[in-house]
């Protein structure tokens, strides 16, 4: 009798683990989409950076956001505020925008390679800059030793955990949009390396600026949507299936 009961328990547990595996294998390892930190106020896309007027737009709260496409492009939006220990009334703040390409190595290392001429930073130090923030180009390759995608047990949404080059975990990011909300995946502000007679380069830049302007005008009409679980095996479904299997197992355990 004990052998039958033990085998039944193993079957129930195996069925539960299989259901979890089927549900997670589809998207659990994908970084595709727009991810945002807990403040849920910082997102990539035209709401953070206007490449036409080269304007960084300050969110209501600090935070971090990354977006990734399926074909190797990424975008980053960062709003950081750090305290001033000498004068708490003068916190320093920086807004950083970058985009470019990314690659994932066989050992799981994630490397972000920005487009050098497109990165921008707005730095504010009110106690030392006379109220005039510093706006400059920004170019910083980022290397993450590894990353992990999982499901937050409390909110039931996907989370992205990035680990810095030395293995230190960063603040977790939460899936906000899929497909990602991003600016065009090409050089937004190319430098003037060609002559004035280069009509193709000039036309390309005008075309890009028109594309970006339309993106800005339609910032509230993006096709990026809040990510919701649409598959049959959602986290709630798994819970009910598991509870049902455990209930049936308990009845069979008592019956035999």
From Swiss-Prot:
InterPro entries: Rot1 (IPR019623). Residues 203-212 have a biased composition (Basic residues). Glycans are attached at residues 103, 107, 139, 229. Keywords: Endoplasmic reticulum, Glycoprotein, Membrane, Signal, Transmembrane, Transmembrane helix. Residues 186-213 are annotated as: Disordered. Residues 1-24 form the signal peptide. One of its GO terms (cellular component) is endoplasmic reticulum membrane. The chain crosses the membrane at residues 236-256. The keyword NAD does not apply. GO terms for biological process: 'de novo' protein folding; budding cell apical bud growth. GO terms for molecular function: unfolded protein binding. Residues 191-200 have a biased composition (Low complexity). The keyword Endoplasmic reticulum applies. It is a single-pass type I membrane protein. It is found in: Endoplasmic reticulum membrane. Residues 25-235 are lumenal. Required for normal levels of the cell wall 1,6-beta-glucan. Involved in a protein folding machinery chaperoning proteins acting in various physiological processes including cell wall synthesis and lysis of autophagic bodies. Controls actin cytoskeleton polarization to the mother-bud neck and CLB2 protein stability. Belongs to the ROT1 family. This is Protein ROT1. It comes from Saccharomyces cerevisiae (strain YJM789) (Baker's yeast). The gene is ROT1.
């Amino acid at each position: 009798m004990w052998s039958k009961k033990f085998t039944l328990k193993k079957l129930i547990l195996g069925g539960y683990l299989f259901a979890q595996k089927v549900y997670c294998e589809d998207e659990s390892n994908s970084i595709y989409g727009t991810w945002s930190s807990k403040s849920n106020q910082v997102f990539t896309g035209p709401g953070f950076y206007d490449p036409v007027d080269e304007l960084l737009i300050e969110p209501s709260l600090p935070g971090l956001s990354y977006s990734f496409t399926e074909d190797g492009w990424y975008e980053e939006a960062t709003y950081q505020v750090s305290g001033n220990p000498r004068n708490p009334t003068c916190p320093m703040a920086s807004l950083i925008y970058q985009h470019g390409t990314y690659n994932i190595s066989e050992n799981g290392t994630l490397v972000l390679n920005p487009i050098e001429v497109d990165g921008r930073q707005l730095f504010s130090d009110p106690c030392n800059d006379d109220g005039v923030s510093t706006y400059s180009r920004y170019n910083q390759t980022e290397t993450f030793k590894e990353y992990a995608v999982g499901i937050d047990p409390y909110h039931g949404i996907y989370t992205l955990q990035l680990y810095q080059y030395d293995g230190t975990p960063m603040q977790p990011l939460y899936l906000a949009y899929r497909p990602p909300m991003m600016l065009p995946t090409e050089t937004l502000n190319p430098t003037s390396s060609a002559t004035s007679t280069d009509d193709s380069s000039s036309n390309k830049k005008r075309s890009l600026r028109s594309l970006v302007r339309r993106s800005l005008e339609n910032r509230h009409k993006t096709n990026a949507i809040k990510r919701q679980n649409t598959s049959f095996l959602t986290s709630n479904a798994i819970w009910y299936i598991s509870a049902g299997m455990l209930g049936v197992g308990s009845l069979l355990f008592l019956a035999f």
